[in-house]
Each structure stands twice: as structure tokens, then as C-alpha cells.
UniProtKB/Swiss-Prot annotation:
The lineage of its organism: Eukaryota, Viridiplantae, Streptophyta, Embryophyta, Tracheophyta. GO terms for biological process: translation. One of its GO terms (molecular function) is structural constituent of ribosome. Keywords: Chloroplast, Plastid, Ribonucleoprotein, Ribosomal protein, RNA-binding, rRNA-binding. It comes from Glycine max (Soybean). This is Small ribosomal subunit protein uS12cz/uS12cy. InterPro entries: NA-bd_OB-fold, Ribosomal_uS12, Ribosomal_uS12_bac. CDD domains: Ribosomal_S12. It comes from the Eukaryota. The keyword Chloroplast applies. Exons 2 and 3 are cis-spliced, while a trans-splicing reaction is required to link exons 1 and 2. HAMAP family: Ribosomal_uS12_B. It is found in: Plastid, Chloroplast.
Amino acid sequence: MPTMKQLIRNTRQPIRNVTKSPALRGCPQRRGTCTRVYTITPKKPNSALRKVARVRLTSGFEITAYIPGIGHNLQEHSVVLVRGGRVKDLPGVRYHIVRGTLDAVGVKDRQQGRSKYGAKKPK
């Protein structure tokens, strides 16, 4: 417990909240260019080949972003829109690529949860 003299000398500092997606710089989304598209394996107990992309953002950051959905058309130099949101079983992946915008096409033949994958309504 500090004394009154100590509190006068230096006041209590408010707790600053640390952002979970610093590369977005406070924006809801950011545009970026893919520098590498590859797969990584999740941590235990899961097993898969998760599709990710290394993206250079307009904010100057180089980040790893997850590519959601089944199948994608992304390659090097593809321009993508990136949003926040981590992937729990992929350490270091704190961003998602938005499907159905810019160069990332929507998921084909998607019936449910279409808005999350940029899929058009089936005829």
C-alpha cells in the first residue's frame, strides 16, 4: 500500500488494454498482398493441413492470416482483405482473410453460413 507522499510523487497509472490485432491499427479490416500461401499443422490434439497466407498489409505489417472455407484461389501477389480473429489451434495466426472480396473468391456450393464465406444465394 503506497503512502500519500508516494502517490503525490507518481500517480496511479490506468490499466491500458492491449489490442489482440495490432497490425490492423484500429481499423476493422485492412487490405494486403499475399507473399506466400502454404499449409501448416495445428497443435495437439488436432490434426489437419490448415491453409494460411503470409500477407503484407497496407499498414506495413507482415502477418499470417487464415484462409477459411473449403478450397481457395489465392496465390502469391493476390490482393486480399484481412480482418481480426485468431485460430485457436494455430499459434501465431491472429487474422482471417475475408472471402468473397478482392481476389479471394467465395466458397463454392456453400448452402449454410454463406455470408461468412462470401457465397452467393443458390438459384
